Amino acid sequence: MNIKIIVIGKIRNEFIKAGVNEYLKRLLPFINIKIEFLPSFSELSEKIALLKEEEIILKNLRNGEFIITLDKDGEKISSEEFSKKLFKLPISQNSQITFIIGGIYGVSEKIKQSSNFILSLSSMTFTHEFALLILLEQIYRALKIQRNEPYHY
């Protein structure tokens, strides 16, 4: 399985970097996973920032990717449902799943419309850094559920 995670903004908190690195270390033996950090335009107005971020996100998408965008208004599913969805996607060995984590303003409507699925991690709002860490933990949990290994109780 190939997973790409597009994140607007970079990680500034060392404890989150440590958590991200820990989950990448756990996942890499089983999943080809990479994270692409794209620039944030949070210093601009919301409208302009969303347009600029939309442009760079779209440039980083390829045909054939199954796109899952994280958004607080997306579908809320359990860890078990996430595992089923992730490992039952109709993708070939050469294609990939791409997750998109927006910046301070989220993602544009065009990005949402370009997505195959919109996922909510919670009704609460998280920084892009926390969203990345939570997503990686949920991908790891999904893998453990799929492999019927202890971790998820």
UniProtKB/Swiss-Prot annotation:
| Phosphoprotein as UniProt keyword | no
Enzyme Commission number(s): 2.1.1.177
Subcellular location per UniProt equals: Cytoplasm
Question: What Pfam family is a match for this entry?
Answer: SPOUT_MTase
Q: Could you confirm whether the keyword Transferase appears in this record?
A: yes
**Main localization category:** cytoplasm
Which residues does S-adenosyl-L-methionine bind?
Answer: 70, 102, 121-126
Q: Which UniProt keywords apply?
A: Cytoplasm, Methyltransferase, rRNA processing, S-adenosyl-L-methionine, Transferase
Q: Which GO terms describe its cellular component?
A: cytoplasm
Q: Explain the purpose of this protein.
A: Specifically methylates the pseudouridine at position 1915 (m3Psi1915) in 23S rRNA.
Stated name of the protein: Ribosomal RNA large subunit methyltransferase H
Q: Which organism is it from?
A: Dictyoglomus thermophilum (strain ATCC 35947 / DSM 3960 / H-6-12)
Organism lineage reads as: Bacteria, Pseudomonadati, Dictyoglomota, Dictyoglomia, Dictyoglomales
